[in-house]
């Protein structure tokens, strides 16, 4: 597809570009960047004056629930939600039914995405067979099938020797390992952050140590193996400190956090609000500040949503039995732009966190507007105001703690391979 994007503020950290430029896409790839570009007659054009033009945003941690759990979400609805949030690519976690631990399931997702998805969908395979944490999955086959990473997300690989072998094997074949880091014995029957609020509500708590201990293990295993590891959804002061120190001594560790961890505290659980129930749980104000600081100083490499759709019947129940997780694809950019408005990040940092660096971690040929690159583009209006309403969310599920919130800033065009797949 051909497209001319005219006069926007192009921000592309992969090239060190922050300037008002035109972007010309031809046959789905970036043909030229410059001022006053001319396009062949009949080429569609977008006037991006006053708007921000970035490489397509990438969410490296989503749950599309397909196969097997399509009553919550499916590839079509999840991709519509992604497009509405400004994401041109998503990487989907393997805790489906059946799990993504075979070439057949990975191929199913890739083929279904080709016919139904508005955006690029990259599957993540399991670290272990069946996601059971007992023996390694066929990582080589998963990579050959198109998986961009492996993870047992939803639960940790508890066996340290098995995780060591996973890191070493993944290093050998060049695939990213994403760790869901928590000590299940410490988590116990906890359902929210352990602290004043959990005590007041009479709910069993999950201590910050459950995350910190598990993150420390992954760091030491990666250091020992000389292998990279990516830590999913960090949420604590300690996790950020451990990773910051590890990076300083050369450990190949990267990590992500989610918008809810730098926006909400465990106070959001008051009223037994199940849309504020997730894993890891919402933490304290000090933890929120640590996430903002980690994003600002480069300790945290990526912002990922952990988009986790659930049917109302799984959320409209007692807090103790409600399932963990929230939808996040359509609110992520607005919540992240708030950090720019607050002066905690600049736009170049934000684009790196939401596009360039996720692409690098997953080994994707995305996250850049270099000539010859795939023509995936997100066009953002930083001043556009909107309200989060369940009826207007594209996701099949509506389990968001941000319903009713007034937001500022959102994607107004999402472009995949030169084709506009979403327009606000």
From Swiss-Prot:
It catalyses: (S)-dihydroorotate + H2O = N-carbamoyl-L-aspartate + H(+). It comes from the Bacteria. Gene3D superfamilies: Metal-dependent hydrolases, Urease, subunit C, domain 1. Its cofactor is Zn(2+). Coiled coil: none annotated. The keyword Disulfide bond does not apply. InterPro entries: Amidohydro-rel (IPR006680), DHOase (IPR004722), DHOase/Allantoinase_Hydrolase (IPR050138), Dihydroorotase_CS (IPR002195), Metal-dep_hydrolase_composite (IPR011059), Metal_Hydrolase (IPR032466). Keywords: Hydrolase, Metal-binding, Pyrimidine biosynthesis, Zinc. Zn(2+) 1 binds at residues 61, 63, 153, 306. Its EC number is 3.5.2.3. GO terms for biological process: 'de novo' UMP biosynthetic process; purine nucleobase catabolic process. Binds 2 Zn(2+) ions per subunit. Pathway: Pyrimidine metabolism; UMP biosynthesis via de novo pathway; (S)-dihydroorotate from bicarbonate: step 3/3. The active site is at residue 306. GO terms for cellular component: cytoplasm. Catalyzes the reversible cyclization of carbamoyl aspartate to dihydroorotate. Belongs to the metallo-dependent hydrolases superfamily. DHOase family. Class I DHOase subfamily. This is Dihydroorotase.
């Amino acid at each position: 597809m051909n497209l001319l994007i005219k006069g926007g503020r192009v921000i592309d950290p992969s090239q060190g570009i922050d300037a008002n430029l035109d972007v010309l896409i031809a046959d789905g790839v970036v043909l030229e960047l410059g001022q006053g570009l001319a396009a062949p007659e009949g080429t569609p054009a977008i006037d991006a004056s006053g708007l921000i033009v970035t490489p397509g945003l990438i969410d490296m941690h989503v749950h599309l629930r397909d196969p097997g759990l399509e009553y919550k979400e499916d590839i079509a609805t999840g991709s519509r939600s992604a497009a509405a949030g400004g994401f041109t690519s998503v990487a989907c976690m393997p805790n489906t039914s059946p799990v993504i631990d075979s070439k057949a399931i990975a191929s199913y997702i890739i083929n279904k995405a080709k016919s139904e998805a508005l955006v690029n969908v990259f599957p993540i395979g399991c670290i272990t067979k069946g996601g059971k944490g007992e023996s390694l999955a066929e990582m080589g086959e998963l990579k050959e099938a198109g998986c961009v990473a492996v993870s047992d997300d939803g639960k940790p690989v508890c066996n340290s020797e098995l995780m060591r072998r996973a890191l070493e094997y993944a290093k050998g074949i060049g695939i990213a390992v994403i760790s869901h880091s928590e000590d299940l014995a410490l988590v116990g029957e906890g359902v929210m952050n352990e602290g004043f609020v959990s005590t007041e509500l009479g709910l069993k708590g999950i201590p910050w140590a459950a995350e910190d201990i598990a993150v420390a293990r992954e760091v030491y295993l990666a250091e020992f193996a000389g292998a990279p590891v990516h830590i999913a959804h960090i949420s604590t002061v300690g996790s950020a400190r451990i990773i910051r120190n590890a990076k300083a001594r050369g450990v190949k560790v990267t990590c992500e956090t989610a918008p809810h961890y730098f926006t909400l505290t465990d106070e959001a659980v008051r009223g037994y609000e199940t849309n504020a129930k997730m894993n890891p749980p919402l933490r304290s104000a000090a933890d929120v500040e640590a996430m903002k600081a980690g994003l600002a100083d480069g300790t945290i490499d990526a912002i990922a949503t952990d988009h986790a759709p659930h049917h109302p019947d799984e959320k409209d129940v007692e807090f103790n039995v409600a399932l963990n997780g929230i939808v996040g694809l359509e609110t992520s950019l607005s919540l992240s732009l708030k950090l720019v408005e607050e002066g905690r990040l600049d736009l170049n940092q934000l684009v790196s966190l939401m596009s360039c660096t996720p692409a690098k971690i997953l080994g994707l040929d995305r996250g850049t507007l270099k000539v010859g690159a795939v023509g995936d583009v997100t066009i953002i209006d930083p001043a556009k105001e909107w309200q989060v309403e369940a009826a207007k969310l594209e996701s099949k599920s509506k389990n968001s703690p941000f319903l009713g919130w007034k937001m500022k800033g959102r994607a107004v065009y999402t472009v995949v391979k030169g084709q506009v797949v979403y327009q606000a």
